[in-house]
Swiss-Prot record:
Role, per record: Catalyzes the reversible formation of acyl-phosphate (acyl-PO(4)) from acyl-[acyl-carrier-protein] (acyl-ACP). This enzyme utilizes acyl-ACP as fatty acyl donor, but not acyl-CoA.
Catalyses which reaction(s): a fatty acyl-[ACP] + phosphate = an acyl phosphate + holo-[ACP]
Subcellular localization: Cytoplasm
Gene responsible for this protein: plsX
Organism from which the protein derives: Gloeobacter violaceus (strain ATCC 29082 / PCC 7421)
HAMAP family, per database record: PlsX (MF_00019)
GO MF term set: phosphate:acyl-[acyl carrier protein] acyltransferase activity
Protein's name in the database: Phosphate acyltransferase
EC number: 2.3.1.274
Pathway where this protein functions: Lipid metabolism; phospholipid metabolism
A GO BP annotation: phospholipid biosynthetic process
Keywords: Cytoplasm, Lipid biosynthesis, Lipid metabolism, Phospholipid biosynthesis, Phospholipid metabolism, Transferase
């Protein structure tokens, strides 16, 4: 970083997720060291401060005290009754300009509700979408799947906007020069699917600002054929969790099927590097959770089970979105006629 570059400041909900605050604090400190970002930890000072002391960082990291918490099982609307919860205060910091991005693990619905209540939608966007990265058969290539849970019920117009935002994200953040957008469907042919998907297809075909490449069947999501795959939040969430489960099952089957005894140990030794690479490519923690596209601020919703590396990845994702001016580019595109 040179002397002319501005340090990115990111607010992190230290109380969200299964391993808060220990893993959240550790991941945030890793991000500060590796990415050069400035971090603000939001949560119960009584819980967060001892963790910072364990890492000798109590004097160098700001804590914003937020005494209330939102549990994993609570309804999203509970955030209205908990204005001092860590997730609401995290979003407040972005709204007030005290942070440029927010990162939160834990209750996805509550995080999205807090972002909408505090930050609001981008002008022209009817519904936000959560985008998640999945690995593909092509080494180094990822596919952006959205929506993965922000809207269980959707409309054709929403899917059209998801496609536009996803294409812009793929182009400017992921570096795909000519992204191909697919619509998740039960067949490749035009006219396939339910009314929602069929109507969305016709809208996407006619939209000159969306690089629409046609329907995407479930088997093609992770082949690398598409750069962006669009669907409603119900289907996207099911698909995302199915993909995560398949990865875990595949690795476990591989371990169980290797020969036992000395031959098995020799085989594992010979394949150690390959197995490590397979695990790394299929590890959801490496992808940092999902970017909440369509809100008037950069918000990353990490997996509820995120540990330190997952939080580091989520913060990296936030920094990439800021560095590549995702919000500005989406706003510019929305000005164009659709």
């Amino acid at each position: 970083m040179n002397g002319w570059e501005k340090t990115v400041r990111i607010a992190i909900d230290a109380m969200g997720g299964d391993y808060a605050p220990q893993e959240i604090v550790q991941g945030a400190l890793l991000a500060r060291a590796q990415l050069g970002v400035d971090i603000v930890l939001v949560g119960s000072a009584e819980a967060v401060l001892p963790e910072l002391r364990r890492h000798n960082a109590a004097q160098s990291v700001e804590i914003v005290d937020a005494p209330e918490q939102v549990g994993m099982g609570e309804e999203p609307t509970i955030v209205r009754r908990k204005p001092n919860s860590s997730i609401m205060v995290t979003m407040d910091l972005v709204k007030q300009g005290r942070a440029e991005a927010a990162v939160a693990a834990g209750n996805t619905g509550a995080a999205m509700a807090a972002a909408l209540f505090r930050i609001g939608r981008l002008p022209g966007i009817e519904r936000p979408a959560i985008g998640a990265m999945l690995p593909t058969l092509k080494l180094g290539k990822r596919v952006l799947l959205l929506d993965v849970g922000a809207n269980t019920d959707s409309r054709p117009r929403f899917l059209e906007q998801f496609a536009l935002m996803g294409a812009l994200y793929s182009r400017y953040v992921l570096g795909v020069a000519e992204p191909k957008v697919g619509l998740l469907n039960i067949g490749e042919e035009r006219g396939k699917g339910n009314e929602l998907v069929a109507d969305a297809y016709e809208m996407l075909v006619k939209n000159p600002h969306v690089p629409f490449a046609g329907n995407c069947e479930g088997r093609d999501v992770m082949t690398g054929r598409f750069d962006v795959v669009v669907c409603d939040g119900f289907m996207g969430n099911v698909l995302l969790k199915f993909a995560e489960g398949v990865g875990l099952v595949a690795l476990q089957i591989l371990r169980e099927e290797l020969p036992r005894g000395i031959p098995g140990k020799i085989g594992i030794a010979l394949m150690r590097n390959n197995l490590g690479q397979v695990k790394q490519r299929m590890d959801y923690a490496a992808y940092g959770g999902g970017l909440l596209l369509g809100v008037n601020g950069v918000c990353i919703i990490a997996h509820g089970s995120s540990k330190a590396q997952g939080i580091l990845s989520a913060i990296r994702l936030a920094k990439e979105a800021l560095d590549n001016r995702v919000l500005e580019r989406i706003q510019q595109q929305l000005i164009l006629p659709m």
